[in-house]
Amino acid sequence: GRGDLPAPGGLSWAGELAALSGYEAATGYGLVTHYYNMKNGLVPPGAVSLCTAPDYVAMRLCGLEKPRTHASLAASLGLFDLDAGSFDHAALARAGLPADMLPEAVRGEALLGETAGGLPVALPIGDNQAGFLGAAGRPDDVLLNLGTSSQLSALCPPSGCPEGLEPRPYIGGARLMTGAGLCG
């Protein structure tokens, strides 16, 4: 992807964003793509916001003009502080990324609004989190998901996630520990 392309300083675009922000950054993170697009003049003039596809669909279903995002989707964009439950504005500034382009990150689960017909629309959650919730979800469960990518996920113990596994926001303020890789 674009994040793996070489940037002028010798690093990849993802590597440059990681060096500037202090956060892990890889192709696939929304802010890696946005960083590349900004640096290469590809952000349309007048663009006011970015969000994930599920956030956009939910926003449109509710007739809203500004997206909101669950922490599980916000974290997938990158430069997200898990402890604060928000994007890291200092890291965004170091990378030259305007914070006002990002959706509001919402802690917890909530109704986003209603459709024009009055049907409730919940704030979407990440696919890894939704898969764990639907297929496992109990404290001692482990979910192995194999597809184009693979994920091994379990709830983090109260003492914290072990090294080598990625902590991801989950529902109810909990975190999933996830090991992920490509299968194909």
Where are the language model's segments positioned?
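Glycine-rich phosphate-binding/catalytic subdomain of phosphoryl-transfer
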Residues: G1-G184
